[in-house]
Each structure stands twice: as structure tokens, then as C-alpha cells.
A protein has these predicted regions:
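Anionic-ligand binding patches
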Residues: 2-4, 10-168
Length: 168
């Protein structure tokens, strides 16, 4: 069975193939399938956004489509950046991290010292016959004072995983 990976993010493609490659069988990127689409992620939750993308790509290709939506939720910022994680600053990863750290500094100035956070990831697999499977998971940690570690993408350099004992 062929499955379309409903993302234009090459980092996500790499991670999905590393984690789920054998379980999914043959996977195609949007580029490999000749699909030029970037559905608007306007859902209120990670699951809604994952479903929006998977449904649209499944509709366009008539193949099963796997999508994810993930983001960082910081307790001191009332869950921000949340579902807007990738678009938090209006720029790229470095700008998003800079804005996140600045907003945490402002929160600390107001007496809010909690830096706990979690990453949420929702995945959706949509089939041409209308079946939909979703799942959501979280990993917990806190935000560091500055970027650390090597590799990763997005907020990985500032998210310290309490489970792993290091930044992503």
C-alpha cells in the first residue's frame, strides 16, 4: 500500500520515515507524488489541523494520506505558541525561538517563573473510503534559557525533555 506523507516539511518526512517507515510500507512525499498543495491549517486543535491536511491530500491523490500537526505548549504563556507554533513569530525557527524566549523573560518579569512545557503531536491517517484514524501524544519538559544541543528543528534546541534528560 502506498501512503502519501501530507507535509512539505522535509524534517517531518525524515522523522516519519525513520519512525514509521516499515509499518507504513511505501511512502511518497507530496513532491514525489507530483502534488502541489499546502492546505491552510486553520483548526483550533492539533488533531483538527492534522485532519485538514490528510483529508485534502487524500482527496487530491485518492491514496491514503498521513499527516501530523505538532507544536509546543508553554504553561507560563497559557499554552502558546500552541497550534500556531510554526507561525508564532511570522518568521522561521530562529525568530520563533527568539520570540518565545522574549515572552518567557517578560513573564518572569511579571513574577511567572514556570518554564514547564510540552510538545503535542497529533497524527491523522485518512483513507479514500472515508475511514479516519487519529492519535495524539505528548512529551513533557521545560524551556531552557538559550538554545542548546546539535540538530533538531523548530523549538528542539530550547525544549529540554525530562524523559530524555536533554534537549531534542
Amino acid at each position: 500500500m502506498k501512503v502519501i506523507l501530507a507535509t512539505n516539511n522535509r524534517h517531518k518526512v525524515k522523522e516519519i520515515r525513520e519512525i514509521l517507515g516499515k509499518a507504513l510500507g511505501e511512502t511518497l512525499t507530496l513532491e514525489e507524488a507530483g502534488v502541489h498543495a499546502d492546505p491552510e491549517e486553520n483548526g483550533a486543535t492539533f488533531e483538527e489541523n492534522a485532519l485538514i491536511k490528510a483529508r485534502e491530500i487524500c482527496r487530491l491523490t485518492s491514496l491514503p494520506a498521513l499527516s501530523d500537526d505538532s507544536g509546543l505548549c508553554v504553561d507560563a504563556l497559557d499554552g502558546a505558541p500552541g497550534v500556531r507554533s510554526a507561525r508564532y513569530s511570522g518568521g522561521g525557527s530562529e525568530e520563533n525561538i527568539a520570540l518565545l524566549l522574549e515572552n518567557l523573560r517578560k513573564a518572569e518579569e511579571r513574577g511567572e517563573r514556570d518554564r514547564t512545557a510540552h510538545f503535542s503531536c497529533a497524527v491523522a491517517l485518512v483513507f479514500p473510503d472515508g475511514r479516519e484514524i487519529t492519535a495524539e501524544g505528548r512529551t513533557y519538559g521545560y524551556i531552557t534559557d538559550r538554545p542548546m544541543g546539535v540538530g533538531g528543528f523548530g523549538y528542539d534546541p530550547v525544549f529540554f525533555s525530562t524523559e530524555l534528560g536533554k534537549t531534542f
